[in-house]
Amino acid sequence: MTITPQQLIAMLPLLIVGLTVVVVMLSIAWRRDHFINATLTVIGLNLALLSLYFVGQVGPMDVTPLMRVDGYSMFYTGLVIIASLATSTFAYPWLVGYPDNREEFYLLVLIAALGGILLASANHLASLFLGIELLTLPLFGLIGYAYRQKRSLEASIKYMLLSAAASSFLLFGMALLYAESGSLSFVGLGQSLSDSMVHQPLILAGLGMMIVGLGFKLSLVPFQLWTPDVYQGAPAPVSTFLATASKIAIFAVVMRLFMYAPAADSEAVRLVLSIIAVASILFGNLMAISQTNIKRLLGYSSIAHLGYLLIALVAVQTHELALPLETIGVYLAGYLFSSLGAFGVVSLMSSPYKGPDAESLFSYRGLFWHKPILSAVMTVMMLSLAGIPMTLGFIGKFFVVAMGVSANLWWLTGAVVLGSAIGLYYYLRVTVSLFLSPPQSLVRDTPSNWALTAGGVVVLISAILVLVLGIYPQPLITLVQMAQPLM
């Protein structure tokens, strides 16, 4: 098969990030320089982000049988690259105090970003699996990067063992689907899995196993047990990547699979997804109430957020595609910027070897009296995650509720409202502790000029975006409406 210039342009983000991986590798081999490698990484990711403009000019197409580049894949590629950029900028000050090799961190982030970009345009079960593995394997190394701390190493081992088990479930599920349908591409699966076939035991078993594998990666109940431990043990910049890029990329590919394959029409599959969604919303929110560690709290809250999103998957079948797709785009954009801001503040407050990460809620007590702007940012992020009006998080929640109502999913909509009410409590708990009187004994190691560091700039931009798009969301909604998949 000959590749035309148009197809090369359509693959630009993948090619640029892949090239950056090679350049950073050679640069590490030539001379270890933390600053140079961090700069190369950021330049490469920015070029990949800019290249999306040219990708948009060539129009939607199937580049290879494995990849379909369209507005949908461009939107999620953009989100993944933004998350990777933020991770790299948060990691720089964190790594400055790190005694061992620092440069490999950026290499792992780039490889994981490559997996995320592949997932955003995956159109075939092979590229789905390749993308998920490319995304997960570097995460083992990233989670255990501060391996001299017992917690980080333990988190890495937990994630690795469970992830391997989940991947094997996923592969076996794919094998069963292939055995029954004889096709691995999403569109081919959609054509061969006609309504009569969905009820065959092999197909249902295959779908069930794929739900287990993907549910683990998205940390949905009951496959969520690793989430709080890993979020807590991983370095703060890595938790950022785990909460944003990996979840967004995998959710994007699951959504695409559901659009093409009518497995969605099966009542059994929808029932299972509805139960998982309600369980995730309630479990995530209820468990977060008692947490005193902010990373664990954000870990549990991410379980709940993916529960809200799962409702869009259930609504895909009952409804035309436009509203669920818009909902997912708006919600994930809001979730991305809110999480980047929240984890960014945690990263700015933590440094690897000056005592433990500032993760306990106690270390945020009275932060307002020392760092008023930083605590204002944290407040905005918490309100956005809770879905308070005038923030981007509210627009996302509003779309979810509107979609649930229009698809007549009353139970699920009720669960969203209930979950948001519970969520309000623990998000406000974090916010209130920022404004209490500060304890005497606490030493803070945030740099006094944090707003001038790269990480500080990312956090401030996230806060501004969350507020501006929360008040006037039209630009984002227009962008999401343009990001339609090629059917």
From Swiss-Prot:
Name the Gene Ontology biological process terms. Answer: ATP synthesis coupled electron transport
Q: Which GO terms describe its cellular component?
A: plasma membrane
Q: Which reaction is catalysed here? A: a quinone + NADH + 5 H(+)(in) = a quinol + NAD(+) + 4 H(+)(out)
Q: Where in the cell is it found?
A: Cell inner membrane
Membrane-topology annotation of the record: Multi-pass membrane protein
For this UniProt entry, which segments traverse the membrane? 8-28, 35-55, 78-98, 104-124, 125-145, 159-179, 203-223, 235-255, 271-291, 297-317, 328-348, 376-396, 409-428, 451-471
Keyword ATP-binding appears in the UniProt entry: no
Q: Which gene encodes it?
A: nuoN
Annotated GO molecular function terms are: NADH dehydrogenase (ubiquinone) activity; NADH:ubiquinone reductase (non-electrogenic) activity; quinone binding
This protein is called what?
A: NADH-quinone oxidoreductase subunit N
| NCBIfam families on file | NDH_I_N, PRK05777.1-1
Primary location: membrane
Q: What is the protein's known function? A: NDH-1 shuttles electrons from NADH, via FMN and iron-sulfur (Fe-S) centers, to quinones in the respiratory chain. The immediate electron acceptor for the enzyme in this species is believed to be ubiquinone. Couples the redox reaction to proton translocation (for every two electrons transferred, four hydrogen ions are translocated across the cytoplasmic membrane), and thus conserves the redox energy in a proton gradient.
Indicate the enzyme's highest-level EC class.
translocase
EC number in record = 7.1.1.-
Name the source's superkingdom: Bacteria
Recite the UniProt keywords alphabetically.
Answer: Cell inner membrane, Cell membrane, Membrane, NAD, Quinone, Translocase, Transmembrane, Transmembrane helix, Transport, Ubiquinone
Q: How does it assemble?
A: NDH-1 is composed of 13 different subunits. Subunits NuoA, H, J, K, L, M, N constitute the membrane sector of the complex.
Q: PANTHER family from the xrefs?
A: NADH DEHYDROGENASE (PTHR22773)
What family does the database annotate? Belongs to the complex I subunit 2 family.
What Pfam families does the entry give? Proton_antipo_M
